[in-house]
């Protein structure tokens, strides 16, 4: 597989272009669901901490800020669904901002709050951030490389006994995420292309039957005459 095939998920590029608005709309709908879930979860967690006496401002305040950001992104996504002219670029912007929000939470709670421990949470974030939405491989690769650059710079700046392990685990998580995200979106485009071809075949068959049904009465009348 060459680079062109990789970036187009193995399909001809011109066949994927009509599906960009469909992809953008699906991503915005997904973002509204994620935004609702995160807004609730990021508020419930600090409340539970307060109820059980584990309130710590450095742990709870970022979650409340993230809940507000998730709510804002959800409302913005809902408004964009009603604006088809700017659907594709705004969908890319909003999904990128949501992915950045999740990554920043992973960086804060793993690298900043626990700088000398193995980055389990951040590795999980590096994996799932590529699976949140359907995007082109080039976009996913940019997201992965940006995240890895942040991790490497941080590990080089802060003394950490698990430096090499953390970098290696984040790198492996990014590779797995890229692989899974590519096949996930590849299968999605495959289903869309299959549905389009089936619809075209049914329309062609319907038009053929209509033409035959119009031709048959004239043929019979000509034979009788």
Task: Give each language-model segment a name.
Residues 1-25:
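Non-catalytic regulatory/interaction regions at protein termini and inter-domain linkers
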Residues 23-37:
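N-terminal membrane topogenic signal
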Residues 38-128, 146-152:
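Hydrophobic transmembrane alpha-helices and their membrane-interface boundaries in multi-pass
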Residues 132, 136-142:
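Alpha-helical transmembrane segments and their helix-entry boundary regions
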Residues 154-159, 163, 188:
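Generic detector of multi-pass transmembrane helix bundles and their immediately adjacent loops
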Residues 160-172:
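Loop-to-transmembrane alpha-helix initiation sites
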Residues 171-200:
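Juxtamembrane or sensor-core-proximal signal-transducing alpha helices
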Residues 196-225:
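Conserved HAMP-HisKA connector
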């Amino acid at each position: 597989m060459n680079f062109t095939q990789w970036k187009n998920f193995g399909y001809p590029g011109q066949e994927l272009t009509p599906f960009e608005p469909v992809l953008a709309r699906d991503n915005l709908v997904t973002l509204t669901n994620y935004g609702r879930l995160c807004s609730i979860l990021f508020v419930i967690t600090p409340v539970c901490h307060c109820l059980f006496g584990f309130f710590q401002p450095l742990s709870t305040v970022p979650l409340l800020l993230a809940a507000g950001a998730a709510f804002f992104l959800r409302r913005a996504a809902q408004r964009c669904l009603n604006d088809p002219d700017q659907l594709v670029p705004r969908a890319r912007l909003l999904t990128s901002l949501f992915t950045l929000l999740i990554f920043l939470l992973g960086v804060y709670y793993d690298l900043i709050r626990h700088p000398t421990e193995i980055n389990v949470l951040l590795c999980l974030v590096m994996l799932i951030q590529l699976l949140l939405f359907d995007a082109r491989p080039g976009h996913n690769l940019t997201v992965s490389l940006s995240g890895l650059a942040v991790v490497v710079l941080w590990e080089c700046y802060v003394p950490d006994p698990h430096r090499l392990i953390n970098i290696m685990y984040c790198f492996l998580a990014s590779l797995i995420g890229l692989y899974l995200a590519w096949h996930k979106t590849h299968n999605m485009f495959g289903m869309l292309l299959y549905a389009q071809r089936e619809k075209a075949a049914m329309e062609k068959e319907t038009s053929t039957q209509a033409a035959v049904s119009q031709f048959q009465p004239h043929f019979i009348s000509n034979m009788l005459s």
